[in-house]
């Protein structure tokens, strides 16, 4: 068996694209090999400057094969038959026929001769290279090929020999290159096979395997953290990213000047993790430590110089942050409200100052006399025009929290400002207390306004993430058990925009998102039966119905309802029942039970005790079964027939008070 080694050597590939490229090229090569009936073991490796493919167990030659290709029927127009022949470069005389389902079809037997594998590998490789689609790619120079970054070299060896491969301006060879910063005179590494390739890269400070680089980083982080008796929080995403920035990772320890530790910890984390790709350290009590860890791309003779350089870069960034922070705390959040007038919320919806005023009114509507909530609502966007958030946009809300605390506005106000953007996705936590009410108001105002502005999601896009916003609203209501009607809240919000025409569009949108939210736990028929925009009430109904309808009594009662509903469907019914017209015992008993339980069912619904309401409906099962078994509904006497139809109509209405049983 033979082996293939391919390396695409380029300028730096963005770290966040490397893992996808590794998996993508692996899948593409595997699939193309299988399509050509070449069954090989394929491995892929991605790094900052190279994508490598290694295939083993390759045959020397491909096996000859015959493939039967179905053509048109013999009765097809001559043009179709000629087209089939032309497509496969055969004459009509070379076609055979076969009977399929009493119809004769033309067939062509395509014969593939035995070929040496090295003859077809260049075709496969070029196809695979072109087939992978980078999220972004580029042309360079005056070359016609396109890739993520300029390609500098292609190494391609099959069984120790260079394959005759041409990709654009590049001709394949057996040359690899080591670490960019460890090369002497741009040293070329001649390789003969995969083991030789891997060893020579390692000798020249390149670790081929992404997973191995990640493991080296993890080990180095833990060792250095433990050496200072400090803790490091697990951050696999950052480890994966820095492994994509380094061909030969070395973990080093730097120190933070004491003066910067007065900054909020989120500022330190954002500066270090997001902007510098550094790892934060904490003491055993969870306090921010005066040290940080970073990954150097290579082991250098003077590690102290590398450390000092990184400390200097971090100090410069933190100096700016400290300056911005001191500038910001010199002003109150309220003093920044005027600046919000210069920030557009949406071209059709005004500015952020107007938005916070609407949000405050929605908060007043949902929670009367909650002073802390209204204060938080009016100030929740003020930090957006602060120096710090201008520099670190990911700290919106968080800086508002610290500024509110600095002003002495209290934890309730500060926490509501901090958490009012939550939840920002299905995995994000839902806020509680005043933060929940503020988050709800902010999201409702945004969603209603953007729907009015014509930004409703479509099949092709949702640029303002309104589907996610709606799910956030639904989660806030349900997880905080907020007893409010979303329909009323939508109407109130629309009034603040001076609009009422879009109510049906918005309520329908929320209903669809609520169905999407509930469908993981409940059957769609149950959801359709129970759903309204009092979502907490809907949840109670769903739980009760789900439990009730798995019982035999529940199933029988549902069947009885459906039978009654089918009988009255399409009938003109007054709904007025005259007990004096009853002539049979079953209808009398059914009427008496209905009258007895009806007020109790209504009371249970008011108390949101749907278990009790459904259990009360169960008392109808015996009399309604007897009614159907012994009473002719469509009596020859029209008055008696109408009276019995009205009785069934009233029973169905009683069921539908609990839930829309007609949808089950």
From Swiss-Prot:
Keywords: Aminoacyl-tRNA synthetase, ATP-binding, Cytoplasm, Ligase, Nucleotide-binding, Protein biosynthesis. Pfam families: DALR_1 (PF05746), tRNA_synt_2f (PF02092). GO terms for biological process: arginyl-tRNA aminoacylation; glycyl-tRNA aminoacylation. InterPro entries: DALR_anticod-bd, Gly-tRNA-synth_bsu, Gly-tRNA-synth_heterodimer. One of its GO terms (cellular component) is cytosol. GO terms for molecular function: arginine-tRNA ligase activity; ATP binding; glycine-tRNA ligase activity. It comes from the Bacteria. Its EC number is 6.1.1.14. SUPFAM superfamilies: HD-domain/PDEase-like. It catalyses: tRNA(Gly) + glycine + ATP = glycyl-tRNA(Gly) + AMP + diphosphate. It is an enzyme of class 6 (ligase). It is found in: Cytoplasm. Signal peptide: none annotated. Tetramer of two alpha and two beta subunits. Belongs to the class-II aminoacyl-tRNA synthetase family. This is Glycine--tRNA ligase beta subunit.
